[in-house]
Amino acid sequence: LANATISGQAYSYAAAPQRFPQWFNYTPIIYTGWSALPTGTYEFYAVGNTCFYNIDQSDGTSNGATTQLGMPITAAGNQVFSGACGLAVDNGAILTGAARWVIEKSSTWVQFQKDMGTGTFTTSGTKRVRALVIYEF
């Protein structure tokens, strides 16, 4: 997205009007728990008031137990959103149990747990998450 004046406005009630891009690249500003933002794919797609946020990153250097990534659109304030990750790596090892993502009400970031509870990631080595995060805004 560009910080520019909008010109040539048009309205469409279709979910994906002709020539309208469905996925937008995104660079998270918040990346808590890594020494630098891991390289990879961060993109989102909005339909109505639902955001689909695709995260597919490479291993990054862990520097904290709390693991969070900024979101492209602030979450709605009516509920907490949560789901399972497609892949998670902690201290260089692929986790064999399910990891999860959580978005609190009105949050601007998504938090990751290394299990389906509140388990935090190791503060050293490498870590990685892969998830399709779906939430209302």
Q: What kind of region is each of these model predictions?
A:
Residues F24-G48, D56-G77, M116-G125:
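Surface-exposed ligand/attachment interfaces on beta-rich extracellular proteins
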Residues Q9-A10, S124-T126:
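Solvent-exposed, conformationally flexible loop/turn segments
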Residues G125-F137:
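Short, structured beta-strand segments at or near domain termini in extracellular proteins/domains
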Residues L1-A4, F44, A99-K105:
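Broad, structure-driven detector of short, well-ordered beta-strand segments within folded domains
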Residues L1-W23:
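Beta-strand-rich solenoidal segments
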Residues G64-T66, P72-D115:
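Extracellular attachment/recognition segments
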